[in-house]
């Protein structure tokens, strides 16, 4: 009896081991299929050991982590880029083909178009044209002021823009003439030709000014034609200061000053007598590319104009503005 039991036990042991191996093999096959590892078709044997499978699985996890990190970084760059001053500069047709929602929040509305496929010169024939869609986009503002360091004289300093992306002049129109000797002449007549801008100097002082080219008459070679323009007062004559004084309305003197002429003393004269007179600025434009087939012209400009005077109470600062411009010329 004991011998028969021992024989049966000896007979059953390989069967249990075989079933355990079969179960382990099937489980391994399922894991491999789940992670894309193919098993051998003959005999149910695996082409790779379990250790190799786990190593490959770990590598896949690392690769997936890297891809997730890259996707997150890319999303962050895209999100930050949406709040910047715009990405790639578009052509006029590309801008017109976009919807409001496609332009909103991208900075494109504050950019002047560019020209593709043109020539690097002014290639228009002599004649009379009308400049339309004239656009000026500043890319740099500098203000002449005393330096921060000791014993440093006044010089143009780079500034930080405090205004939203609404400083571009656009839809400006006017006659544009090309003479037989190659010179050009442009007169500004209409359009969005001014924009209120505020910049901040490195020391913290904020400088408001009215970026404009009102009544501009510029002439010269296409490589460099310049002219003067009118700079209106930053504030109108009906603007009232905190004490109710204005140019065409409000009090003549500060409130509560005693009579007897003390309100017109020299130190208070500029504050009491508001000055809304306009000043002058100058601008130089250069053509960098043109496309006669479409009538498009692009270039760069540099403008020099005074800042706000607070209705005559402050000495204006010189503001230098650099940027790009775009226009469409239609022959008359």
UniProtKB/Swiss-Prot annotation:
The keyword Plastid applies. The keyword Transit peptide applies. Gene3D superfamilies: photosynthetic oxygen evolving center domain, Photosystem II, cytochrome c-550 precursor. InterPro entries: OMP/PagP_b-brl, PsbO. SUPFAM superfamilies: OMPA-like. Pfam families: MSP. GO terms for cellular component: chloroplast photosystem II; photosystem II oxygen evolving complex. GO terms for molecular function: oxygen evolving activity. It comes from the Eukaryota. Keywords: Chloroplast, Manganese, Membrane, Photosynthesis, Photosystem II, Plastid, Thylakoid, Transit peptide. It is found in: Plastid, Chloroplast thylakoid membrane. GO terms for biological process: photosynthesis, light reaction; photosystem II assembly; photosystem II stabilization. Stabilizes the manganese cluster which is the primary site of water splitting. Binds GTP after preillumination of photosystem II core complex. This binding is inhibited by DCMU. Belongs to the PsbO family. This is Oxygen-evolving enhancer protein 1, chloroplastic. The gene is PSBO.
